[in-house]
């Protein structure tokens, strides 16, 4: 046990690790006792524990440990931030970093090269500890599904969709993935993936409503840059002006809605916190959508960031608070490498009538990344 404590305190001594037999004693304890002990250790130390032995590595990646953490209330969500470099498509890669909002520190997750560079810009969503990559990116239709288990670190290929899709809208409703558009109008417009049965089925699509998905405004299927779910409906934000739609998962009816500036939505921070949709505009700040009046309203009490000093931002739900991340454009030489800072604010949101006020609970520097990296996606992952 002392050997594990040495590692946790970041003070391992090679000769102690080589000679100390305490790990054998620890391993000889009943399996449930070992799991209970490890479950009470912060996940930030698991990479160190994995280096102790193969048995430790197996334990910290086991689903039983994840379940034990959940039982004792240690399954706090962790934010996974995806960064993309700005190299040409063929040379690009995804790099993931983790942020524990309680510890305000980042740690590098083992980065992985995607199987196909076309998967780089495909939509991604999270359910529990797993991250799902769906379809293809711009100019490339793919039916593929990749599943990354953030607990075990494994990336595997899931069942393919019935249709190949380019930048479909993807959101999670009642534990299922709803995938919309990104294909021709004569193809299946909506597919639903059930993670439990690992099967795809055709989603409902009604001819009633303001617009039919895949017809009219959506003739060639939406090329969606962001999608979020709220109260059984999927809100799809498109690259095309006037093509932002709301899809009802119950009956397949669709209606259009406008973004805050009435234009196409390129990319930026979007998330749902406490059943409210939030977006970030450089020139408008943090906005929220009022579905009753069908209008966007500004979140009061927050200062706008200087658009000249930031690049792409990320937003994520952190236990009912709004996690807001951004990188600055200032380059710094750190340990001989050119890097830039990544900042995070934790915002408490309070609603009063038709107004929502935001209060910054804390704001801090949380890490550094190479200067050519951009925030591409923020996902809340639970264990």
From Swiss-Prot:
Residues covered by the F-box domain: 23-71
Domain of life: Eukaryota
Repeat (Kelch) residue spans along the chain: 130-175, 176-220, 269-317
InterPro entries tied to this protein: F-box-like_dom_sf (IPR036047), F-box/kelch-repeat_ARATH (IPR050354), F-box_dom (IPR001810), Kelch-typ_b-propeller (IPR015915), Kelch_1 (IPR006652)
Keywords, ordered alphabetically: Kelch repeat, Repeat
Database matches in Pfam families: F-box, Kelch_FKB95
SMART domains assigned: FBOX (SM00256), Kelch (SM00612)
PANTHER family in the cross-refs: F-BOX/KELCH-REPEAT PROTEIN SKIP4, GALACTOSE OXIDASE_KELCH REPEAT SUPERFAMILY PROTEIN
Protein name: F-box/kelch-repeat protein At2g22030
Organism: Arabidopsis thaliana (Mouse-ear cress)
